[in-house]
């Protein structure tokens, strides 16, 4: 929510969970920045996080988001990183209190290349999901993905 010109706004978020992930309600300030042409965008949110049905429901979360378009828009590097406190147990019964998750993405924007139709809004790329102690997992996980996306 932003009703003023300053780069700081109010951020309200709901994360709905299924089964082993509890519902969470988040609120806090957000700082957002962008270059004049929006080729570079950055945001950070520092939030209070209430997690339903958790033994310790009062927590925090820090989130960073970014988008960088470069080489005349041919390539995009974007993603987010979250760090939060949440008491939980992994599949082996080990207790964890902090979680880190990031999902950087790299895209090749085909319609920005010579001899490619400008209406072909197709990008090919990859996302790398990396997390530590997320959900019922113990330790660090890396899940690479190949992807295609259409930009409307």
Regions found by a protein language model. Name each.
Residues 12-20, 33, 46-52, 68, ...:
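Transmembrane beta-strands of outer-membrane beta-barrel pores
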Residues 47-95:
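Short helix-loop boundary/capping segments
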Residues 27-29, 62-66, 104, 146:
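Membrane-embedded beta-strands of outer-membrane beta-barrel proteins
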Residues 1-9, 34-43, 69-77, 110-123:
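Short loop/turn motifs that connect adjacent beta-strands in outer-membrane beta-barrel proteins
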Residues 15-25, 50-59, 88-98, 132-142:
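Solvent-exposed loop/turn segments connecting transmembrane beta-strands
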Residues 1-34:
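Hydrophobic alpha-helical segments and helix pairs
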Residues 140-152:
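Outer-membrane beta-barrel "beta-signal"
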